[in-house]
Amino acid sequence: GSEMCIRDSSDTIQKGGTILGTARCLEFKTEAGQKKGAEICRRHGIDGLVVIGGDGSYRGAQAMSRLGINTIGLPGTIDLDIACTEYTIGFDTAVNTAMQAIDKVRDTSSSHERCSIIEVMGRNAGYIALWCGVGTGAEDILLPEKYDYDEQQLINNIINNRKKGKTHHLIINAEGIGHSTSMAKRIEAATGVETRATILGYMQRGGSPPCLCLLYTSDAAD
């Protein structure tokens, strides 16, 4: 391929995904693979790497640094699970995308007087669930950091809200807890309220970045 220049980044600021591409390399998890990577850098005269990614990418960046390659790590993950930073590239995009979907599900949940369980991504971190839950006014938010949630309390909340005249109920469930479909069946059986589970999935990893994501990314690039 040809060498990149500044013009290659023109008109990309509002695009989702990555113009560089992304992939996993199982070989790089081994010491031999890491040494091979460092040798390739030296062979091609690469005197520094900028690594954008999450936990796995940071482990790889650390390995390259230990092997003498100048390395800079930029936190890029929707999960917001990188230590020593309050923000990761992609998080706000994922939250905004998820919230738009949640609002649509809430509309139909309200129309049909249902309980909706919406599962969002985040691996073992509950930040997307927390932000989406607060931002959409969910009645309950389930986080892996607080895994000892009481399902009976969820059931009681739904029943009590019905008694107060609230006709629909929104539960945001983090990927780290999961099992949304089976949870919906148990809640419906216990409450008599029609309950549906929606797993948003990979749609959260795409979309045009909102302002906050653009600002943080530009700042990180500087």
Identify the residue ranges that each predicted region occupies.
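Conserved small/polar residues in nucleotide/adenosyl-binding loops
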Residues: 1-8, 216-222
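Glycine-rich oxoanion-binding loops at beta->alpha junctions
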Residues: 2, 7-51, 89-96, 100
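Short, ordered loop/turn segments at secondary-structure junctions
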Residues: 24-25, 54-57, 69, 74-80, ...
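Accessory alpha-helical/coil subdomains and C-terminal extensions
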Residues: 51-53, 63, 91-194, 198
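Acidic/polar active-site rim loop that often engages polyanionic ligands
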Residues: 74-87, 110-111
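Short beta-strand elements at the ligand-binding edges of bilobed clamshell
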Residues: 84-95, 207-215
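Catalytic, metal-anchored helix/loop core of enzyme active sites in primary metabolism
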Residues: 188-193, 200-218
